[in-house]
Structure formats: C-alpha cells, structure tokens
Amino acid sequence: MQGRSFGIAVAVTLFWSLPSPALQPLDVFVASARERNPDALEAKAGLSQQNAQSDVALGRVLPGISARGAYTRNQYGTTVDLGSGPVTVVPDHQWDGSATVTVPLIDAAGWARVAAAKTTADAAGFQLASARLQVEAQVAQNYYQLIADFALVAVSGTALEVSKESLRLAQNRLAAGVAPALEVDRARADVEQQTQQLAAALLQLSLAARALESNSGVFPDLSVPAPLADDLHNEPALASFESELNRLPAVVAASGSTRAAEQDAGAQRFALLPSVAGTFSERGTTAPGFTGHDWTWQAAINFAWSFDLTSIASIRSQDAGADVARARELRVRLAARDAIHRQWETVAASIARSRSARAGRVAAAHAAQQAHDRYQVGTITQLDLLQAQRDAFAAEVARIQADADLVNARAQLRLAAGKSLLERNEGVQ
C-alpha cells in the first residue's frame, strides 16, 4: 500500500503537465495589457500629444482670424463744428471693434516645421507599437513564470506528501525494531524542510500572480494548474528574424525621430529668409472722427526679417540635435539586432536545457522509486532514500523552470522580431 501511494505521487508529479482546464490564455492578458498597462497608456497619450503638436505647427502657417472689442468712458467729450454739422471726435461713451484676417504668404521656416511635426507624430505612432510589444514581453514573462510557480506549488505539495509517507515508513520500521530513532528524526526534519519549500513556492505564486495582474489588469484564475508544453522544435534561421530589422517599430520610430530632427535643422536655416504675410482688417467705432464712417477696412502686406548671433547659434544647436538623434537611432538599431540574436540563442540553449531536464526528471523519479522500494526491504540506508527524493524534487523543479524558460524565450524572440503574441505561434502553447 505504501509503495502504491508513493507510485501515485510520482505519477502525479510526472504527468502534471498533461492538458487540463487552466487559467486564462495568454491572449487575454496580452490584449488587456495593450490597452490598460501604464506604459501603453503613456505611449498612447504621447501619440495624442504629438498629433496635437502637429496641428499646432500647421495652424501657424494657415490663415487665421482675430477680433477685439473695447468700451471707453471718456470724462470729456470733444465735438467740432465744421459748418456742415458737428463732428464728434471723442464721444462720452466710445465703442470700438475690429476683426483681422491674417494670411501667411511666404513662411519657409514654418512650412518646414510643419513637416517636422508631422514626422514626429508619425514616429510617435511607431513608438506606441514598440511600447505595446514591450508590454507584451513583460506580460509573457510574468505569465510563464506564473505557470512555472503554479507547477512548483503542485510539485512541492507532492514532495511534502512523499516526505510524510517516508516518515510513516520510518516510524513503522522503528516500531518493528529494524530502524533506530535517528531515522524518524531525519524523516521528520525532511517533512519540515518540504513544508518550508511549499510555503516558499506559495509565496512565489502569489507574487507572480500579482505582477501579472498589475501588468495586464486581469486577475489570473488560479483554481486549476495550467498546461505548459513545448515540442522542442528548432526555430528558423536567425537571418529570417533579422531580415525585418528595419521594419521594427522601435527602429522605425528612431528613424522618424532622426528625420524630424533633420527637418527641424533645415527649418532653422529657412528662418534666415524673410517671411511675408497679408492682413485684412475691418474696424467699427462710434468715434469715426473726420472720416465720417463708422466702419472702415484696411489691407496690408507685412514683411519681416531679422538676423543676429542667435540665428547662427540656433542653426548649430539644431544640427547638434540631429547628430544626437542619429546616434540614438544607431543605438536602437544595434539594440534591436542584439535582442533578436540574444533571444534566438536563448531559444537554442533552452531547447537543450529542456531536453536534458526532461531526461533528468525521468531518471531521478525512477531512482527515487527504486530507493523507496529498496529502503522498504532494508537494502539501503535512509540517507540514500532522502537523497534520492531530494534529487527527484530538484530534477522536477529544473524541468519546470527549463520548460517555462523555453516557452517564454520563443515568445520573447517573436516580440524582438516585431511580431505580436496575439498572432498564434505554431509549436507553442
């Protein structure tokens, strides 16, 4: 009976990863995080801000209208009699109003700034896409770690039951007079150690669940363990992932920022050119004076030009800003390429780790079963049994973490290559 109980415990440990009802799919957390994660919300607000700034720049080179009005109470009114009738120069109660339409005719610097602002807004759109991919990476990391911690809790619980069964076996051997009290003490100490392992596993599970909830805005359902499996297939060649480097949202956003900085530098040079604007004003007043008309209009063409030391210094400043943007673009491009390479190599290493960990898990579980059977008949010491059980537990923990790291590495590779996890990936569950 005791041997059968131990075998059942080992079977539960070995086959915990078989398909079963589980917590919500990764897509649920990813979709929510893309809209509710603070980083995604910040990037989305940044896009709205840049679009508004683009409209501000455009508005400065488009026709505009302004109006003003005033009421004046004069202490003394002034009236002049010109023979044909009195002319009010300064009334006691004076009302004035005017409206002016301004039309920029030539503003090369303003037009260039409009183009730069539009480029910056476009870059912000790609920055939002990049931020969402980064959010997905965080969610995937938390999700698969949660599954690993969930599995570790199950394994720790199984190990505790196995340890308790070993304690009962030691107590029976002591009662039969074939084992010393030392074996019971060792078995009891092992039970307490496994209890501590289970408490630590529960803590990690709770922390992982909270981290996933904070990143995604969705509370994970922890009622049933989730499956974690990978078929150990190799990924396509590294070149297939690096081929889309220039289309990655982060790279496109950095390139757009560089182009916008260059356009701003060009706009600063255009500021050396004069600007020309036309105005048309309509004025109404209760004090027309000698004109004799309450309403008058005025049309004008205005010419503006200025030059001083700040003009040259501003050009140099904008040129330096463009150089900074180019350096940042290069850094982003290199970092993106390195991230793809790192994740691709991580997947390759994780496949080897997972394959080895699975084989080690099976061997360690078999060794633990043999040690249990041999300890029952007294052919090995209790220390041998405890060591075999600890080795089996360590092997199972290593297998769980290796599988979780592998599945996560595949997800991180696709994200590094600019592919959202909302697109299903073959071979990964």
Placement of each model-derived feature along the sequence:
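N-terminal signal peptide c-region/cleavage motif recognized by signal peptidases
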Residues: 17-20
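A small-residue-enriched
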Residues: 28-105, 127, 137, 214, ...
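Bacterial N-terminal signal peptides that target proteins for export
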Residues: 1-8
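Periplasmic alpha-helical coiled-coil/stalk elements that build and connect Gram-negative outer-membrane
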Residues: 132-247, 343-346, 350, 392, ...
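Acidic, low-complexity, intrinsically disordered peripheral segments
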Residues: 75, 398-429
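A short glycine-centered flexible hinge/capping loop motif at secondary-structure junctions
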Residues: 174-178, 375-379, 416
